Regions:
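Structured alpha/beta or helical-core interaction and ligand-binding surfaces enriched in interleaved
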Residues: 1-103, 107-157
Length: 157
């Protein structure tokens, strides 16, 4: 299995990716939204993999048998404040949670439509978010990751 959403994985699996603003891993009612989306489109186990070095004694990976709101909340607690990848057993549905106030959601179009009924509108909304973030003092790293997130949505052009 993998630890990141790579362009090769996206190409090899034939899935698509969308970026979304997210100051924390899950906001508002997203536990329900994500649980419902994974249950409907990718039934089976979910895996969470940290993309960071973890202190000794901390789990690097977590598996849950079902995607329920409670299970997703436990995963969010386990990986609080860290980059982590949440993906389905078939590895065709994934969410990369970042520390840079956004997440990437990848999968077949029906999976993406559960989050974003209008994909073009979501791309515009994320570009507005990126532009606003870059209007404040920021590091080159922030600019790089936000620009890269937008490039993941180039398939919509």
């Amino acid at each position: 299995s993998q630890r990141a959403l790579s362009r090769k994985w996206i190409s090899d699996t034939g899935v698509f990716a969308m970026a979304a603003e997210g100051i924390v891993h899950f906001v508002d009612d997203e536990y329900k939204l994500f649980a419902d989306a994974f249950r409907a489109e990718a039934p089976g186990r979910l895996f969470g993999i940290s993309n960071e070095d973890r202190p000794p004694g901390w789990d690097h990976a977590v598996m849950v048998e079902q995607s329920t709101e409670d299970e997703l909340e436990q995963i969010a607690i386990e990986f609080f404040g860290q980059y982590f990848l949440l993906f389905s057993e078939d590895e065709r549905h994934a969410v990369l949670f970042t520390q840079a106030d956004y997440k990437l959601i990848a999968g077949p179009l029906p999976f993406l439509h559960r989050f974003f009924p209008d994909l073009s509108a979501q791309k515009r909304e994320f570009i507005e978010f990126k532009n606003e973030e870059l209007s404040y003092p920021h590091t080159a790293w922030v600019e790089l990751v936000l620009e890269n997130a937008v490039r993941f949505m180039d398939w919509l052009d």
